[in-house]
């Protein structure tokens, strides 16, 4: 869902090439219905471009940077050479996510028995303003526990969250570090095992032996902040047990 009629200078946009000429190419902006773009041959690639068709063809989708906007004609000037591969991959992924979000939004509207334009004005536009993209709003709803977005009201919220949880998979993030554990006691091995035994209800925690005296810990969660909190809690538990059992422990975050 796009709430702007035109992109701004500097924006990255997904362009479908419609016509390739000797000195440039025309295309339509996938995220901006009715808006066309033009890539001059000098903005196709760095260096001299002998054959433009070596770089562009009809039907091809490319990511370009907006370098000029004509609001009256709804035409923008574009540059292909000013976009690197990393930016291009990220933009294509973002665009595909927004396509998915638009389809999910239509499902939300259908369950509410309202048309998409009505829903867009009631809450869609505001969600994009708050989260930056519609997909980000669905991600937020999918991760919610309890009331989601208390600053907004409406019967649409429960349906939106329901659709989000049914269709959005939140990838896990991980944080890690290393414990160095020492004990000179006769039963030191058993003490170290006890120190490094983490309660199962702490979270998704993996502990692996690297080589004496090092152990690697990895904490996984769908929320980075929560993963950090779990890791901090584990370190606290280990330190408390180590002190009680007279085991030396040093922790270094990776």
Swiss-Prot record:
Chain ranges of the S1 motif domain: 10-81
Keywords per UniProt: Initiation factor, Protein biosynthesis, RNA-binding
InterPro entries according to UniProt: NA-bd_OB-fold, S1_domain, S1_IF2_alpha, TIF2_asu_arc, TIF2_asu_C, TIF2_asu_middle_sf, TIF_2_asu
Family, similarity comment: Belongs to the eIF-2-alpha family.
PANTHER family from the UniProt entry: EUKARYOTIC TRANSLATION INITIATION FACTOR 2 SUBUNIT 1 (PTHR10602:SF0)
Subunit structure and binding partners: Heterotrimer composed of an alpha, a beta and a gamma chain.
Annotated function: eIF-2 functions in the early steps of protein synthesis by forming a ternary complex with GTP and initiator tRNA.
Protein name per Swiss-Prot or TrEMBL: Translation initiation factor 2 subunit alpha
Gene: eif2a
